[in-house]
């Protein structure tokens, strides 16, 4: 399998660093919206710095893998394994941080297309690095298995493929190697091969765990887009509901205004009718009385 290093391309973060430098050197005194965007870009710059650091760490992991596959002394091998474990631990810590930071950036850019583009750019870079890390681990897993198989066939040259595979997958190896250990002339070789195969087996278990975590992380980062869209849909629904409430409120208000106008008109009509009745009473009752009195 190919050992090609997926990190030999140019640094993909230079463009963002240049953009951030321009923003940091821009004159002050902008509006609150501009200040907010600069603060957001500072956050993006921090994410890109951690992405670059993450890339460097998995480069080191790739280099450690290659060194472990070469002929090294037992002391060198132990040192390489300690160093490899440290790099893997650093990568794991950064993965959690990057996931949280990118999710936070996406949340901040929920209603700003420029911010959304920057956050999405970081997410895509992270996805690529995760995929590259998975390829590195997958290559090392296959090469480690092949090396362990070669070590086993040194002491069991007539072993079938099934027997070799069983030896690689047996964590203890005692039963698999018992026949070889019975051969006094090859006892030392068998013990050395047993130790190597056991070490490779433990390494393969760690690799499988790391690869499972990377697969889960990759899926989580892909689902961030779905989650982000769901948040947008919820907000849009809330805005739509609020708009409907406003429209309904305006409708109720208009109805109340119309009712009030109608009530005022009815009141005026009643007053006019009362005035007419009063006038009729005056004409019919009061006026004749006054005329009669004068006579």
Swiss-Prot record:
Single GO MF descriptor: SNARE binding
Membrane topology recorded in Swiss-Prot or TrEMBL: Single-pass type IV membrane protein
CDD domains given in the database record: SNARE_Sso1, SynN
SMART domains reported in the protein's UniProt record: SynN, t_SNARE
Gene3D superfamilies per record: 1.20.58.70
A Gene Ontology cellular-component term: endomembrane system
Presence of the UniProt keyword Cell inner membrane in the record: no
Extracellular side: 292-295
Leftover remarks: Present with 1720 molecules/cell in log phase SD medium.
Family the entry assigns: Belongs to the syntaxin family.
Name this polypeptide is given: Protein SSO2
Species whose genome carries this gene: Saccharomyces cerevisiae (strain ATCC 204508 / S288c)
